[in-house]
Amino acid sequence: MEARILQSSSSCYSSLYAVNRSRFSSVSSPKPFSVSFAQTTRTRTRVLSMSKKDGRTDKDDDTDSLNYKDSGVDIDAGAELVKRIAKMAPGIGGFGGLFPLGDSYLVAGTDGVGTKLKLAFETGIHDTIGIDLVAMSVNDIITSGAKPLFFLDYFATSRLDVDLAEKVIKGIVEGCRQSECALLGGETAEMPDFYAEGEYDLSGFAVGIVKKTSVINGKNIVAGDVLIGLPSSGVHSNGFSLVRRVLARSNLSLKDALPGGSSTLGDALMAPTVIYVKQVLDMIEKGGVKGLAHITGGGFTDNIPRVFPDGLGAVIHTDAWELPPLFKWIQQTGRIEDSEMRRTFNLGIGMVMVVSPEAASRILEEVKNGDYVAYRVGEVVNGEGVSYQ
C-alpha cells in the first residue's frame, strides 16, 4: 500500500517545505471519553532532560551502576505529573485517548522520539527517524484495537535544511505506509537561535478508529491468561538518555562494532522502531486478544500492569527469549541492575499481548509455521505488579 498524502486548507504537503505552515484552531466539542485501563498513576509519561548528565561528555566512575534518573530522566516525577494532570482531566489512563463517535471510538495518541535524535545528529541517519515517530503513536493506539486512520507531524528547527527535512519526511511517509494510514498534514517551524545548528525536534499525532463493541480494554483478563511477546528491533525510541551515558563510558564510537553483534553500534542503536499495526490487528481479528501493552518508557515493570484489572499481576519468564546483544552490552557496560533494565528498556520485546490460553496455542502454532516470531513470555496471576523468574 502506498502512503496517502492528503491536502487540507490549513496544511498541505504539496508545499512540503514551506516554513509558514502554522495553524491555530479553537473548537467547542463534546467532552472526550477515555477508557482508563488502570489507575492513572500507571499512565505512560515521557520525561526528557537536556541536563549535563545527559550528554556524552559527562564523566562518571566506571564502577558506578548507571540508572535512568541519574541520566536526567525521572520516571517517578513523570508519574507525579500525571497524577496532577488527572485532577484536571480525569479521563486519562490508557495508551491512547478514546473519543465517542457514533458506534465507534476515535483513538488518538501523540509522542516524539526523545533523545534518539541526538544519535541521529551524530550518525547522520535521518531517513528512518520518521519511522520511529510514526511507530511511537500508532503502536499506542492499536492497544485499543484501533486501525490507524491518519497521522500529523511537527518538525521544528533553527534553520531549515531542505535536504535534511526531506529525509525525515521520507521516513514519516514510510511509517505511514507500514501503518496503512494517511499522512494528513504537518507543521514546519523555523525557530532561529532556539535549536543548535543542524538540529531539529519532532512530534507526531495519530488517530485511529475502533467499533465500540470491539474495543480492547483489558476488562476480561483473568488469572491464567497468557502473555505473548512480539520482538523489538532494538532500543526503539526510549531510554536513550541512559544509552548515551553508557556509550560515553564505553569509549567506543558509533562506528565501532557492537560487541557480540553483527552491525555497528550506530546502526544497532538507530534501528527503527517496529510498527506492529498489521500483525496485531490480524491477531485481534482472529480472536482471543484481551489486552495489549506497548513496551516503551517504564519497560515491562510499568507498562504491563496498565492493561490489567485490579487484583491481577504478571509473572515473566526471562528465559523465554534471548536477550539481544545490544541490551547485554548496555547492561554490562553500564553495570545496570536488572530492575533498572526492566523499567527502562524493552529488552527485545516491543509489544505484549494478553490472550486466552486457546488463542496462545493458535498463535504459537502459527509461529511454528513461520508466519511470524512471537514468544510465550509469561502468565497473568492473582496479585499486583510484575515478578520475574
Swiss-Prot record:
GO terms for molecular function: ATP binding; copper ion binding; phosphoribosylformylglycinamidine cyclo-ligase activity. This is Phosphoribosylformylglycinamidine cyclo-ligase, chloroplastic. It holds the Pfam family AIRS. Transmembrane segments: none annotated. Residues 46-65 are annotated as: Disordered. Belongs to the AIR synthase family. Its EC number is 6.3.3.1. It is an enzyme of class 6 (ligase). InterPro entries: PurM-like_C_dom, PurM-like_C_sf, PurM-like_N, PurM-like_N_sf, PurM_cligase. Pathway: Purine metabolism; IMP biosynthesis via de novo pathway; 5-amino-1-(5-phospho-D-ribosyl)imidazole from N(2)-formyl-N(1)-(5-phospho-D-ribosyl)glycinamide: step 2/2. It comes from the Eukaryota. Residues 1-58 form a transit peptide. GO terms for cellular component: chloroplast; chloroplast stroma; mitochondrion. Keywords: ATP-binding, Chloroplast, Ligase, Nucleotide-binding, Plastid, Purine biosynthesis, Transit peptide. Disulfide bonds: none annotated.
